[in-house]
Design a protein with these regions (language model features):
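N-terminal helix-turn-helix DNA-binding module of bacterial transcription factors
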Residues: 1-61, 335
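Alpha-helical recognition/docking segments in bacterial nutrient-uptake
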Residues: 3-4, 58-173, 236-240
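Short beta-strand segments enriched in small/hydrophobic residues
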Residues: 16-18, 55-71, 182-191
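Hinge/beta->alpha junction and helix N-cap segments in small-molecule ligand-binding domains
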Residues: 68-77, 96-105, 160-170, 186-231, ...
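Short acidic capping loops at alpha-helix termini that bridge into adjacent secondary structure
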Residues: 181-182, 216-217, 267-273
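Flexible loop/turn connectors
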Residues: 229-336
Length: 336
């Protein structure tokens, strides 16, 4: 448990204001008293530099990060890595609030009034509604989105996102250019997931296909441990196997690739597979996918957050990062 300024004051037998002055205005404190405070701080492993900055600025030096789903997923972990690289160097901590269910989401916003000790709130891939935005705004700190829904319309202070419409259209055009018309799209259950980005991704893919006279079959999976096995069961239960499969994310495409090959299918000869993310294993497996760069997006979001905290105006508060199609070896021209 971290020691507080109150703990230091109690151990040094001085007031909290004396501890504060020892850090921020040492010229107003006698050497004897200041030495007592510093000795107590050392014994309690109290962070002098951090506390001094907090006391001087009146800030918490803490950023709240709202994450939908599991934080060990590639996108979430990469985003947190990018945020931490910037915030850590500036003396800020990150408090992560993970919301994997509607209940956890409701609990967070119900408890929001007691969570005012943050300097900004960052919302990652979260399909947040107008009422929740108003609740966040009541804390009176900047709200920054990363791949979040309608950030400009819903009152975010700033936001970064990948162009999911462009990315999905690139994936759809790629498969159709290879001659595929019998396409399946695998996605997570929207009633379960709180991700916004994947919903826009799905809608754009379907729209591009339908514009070209193709109606993909949609398979829905959950986020359980055996979800890919269930998807393979769904695929094998179809009247016939699709010639191409587009996956909502690499986290579905990578295990699907292995499961299909275990069931006797050769990728891409029997079926083409395309993912979305260009995650850590995509290159080694030769997965055709759509690249996004969550670390870079998060770093930019963190820099904008710091500017907003300091009251500096942003030249471009809402930024869109382009998607990129990465063609590897899991997609090929239609063979049948």
């Amino acid at each position: 448990m971290k020691s507080s300024i109150q703990d230091v004051a109690q151990l040094a037998h001085v007031s909290i204001s004396t501890v504060s002055r020892s850090f921020t205005r040492p010229d107003l404190v006698s050497k004897t008293t200041r030495d007592k405070v510093m000795k107590a701080a050392d014994e309690l492993n109290f962070s002098i530099s951090r506390s001094a900055a907090a006391l001087k600025t009146g800030r918490a030096l803490r950023i709240a990060v709202l994450v939908s789903g599991r934080i060990n997923l590639w996108f979430s972990s990469s985003t947190i890595e990018g945020l931490n690289e910037i915030f850590h160097n500036e003396g800020y901590d990150i408090s992560i609030y993970q919301m994997s269910s509607i209940e956890e989401r409701r609990e967070f916003f119900d408890m929001l009034p007691v969570r005012r000790n943050v300097d900004a709130v960052i919302v990652i891939s979260f399909d947040i509604d107008a009422n929740e935005i108003e609740q966040l705004r009541s804390v009176n700190v900047p709200i920054i989105g990363i791949n979040s829904s309608l950030p400009e319309e819903r009152g975010f202070s700033a936001a970064v996102r990948i162009d999911d419409k462009q990315g999905s259209e690139l994936a759809a055009r790629h498969l159709m250019a290879l001659g595929h018309r019998d396409i399946a799209y695998i996605r997570t259950n929207r009633d379960v997931t709180l991700h916004f980005s994947v919903q826009g991704r799905f809608e754009s893919f379907m729209a591009r296909c339908k514009e070209n006279g193709v109606t993909p079959r949609v398979l829905v999976t959950d986020e359980s441990k055996n979800n890919i096995s269930k998807v393979v069961t769904q695929l094998l239960s179809l009247d016939h196997m699709p010639t191409a499969i587009a996956c909502q994310e690499d986290g579905i495409a990578v295990p699907l690739l292995f499961q299909l090959e275990r069931n006797g299918f050769t990728v891409p000869n029997d079926v083409s597979i395309i993912g979305y993310d260009d995650s850590i294993y995509a290159r080694d497996l030769g997965l055709t996918t759509v690249r996004q760069k969550p670390i870079e997006m998060a770093q930019e979001a963190a820099r904008m957050t710091l500017d907003l905290i300091e009251g500096r105006p942003l030249e471009q508060p809402f930024k869109t990062f382009p998607a990129q199609l990465i063609v590897r070896s899991t997609t090929a021209h239609l063979h049948r």
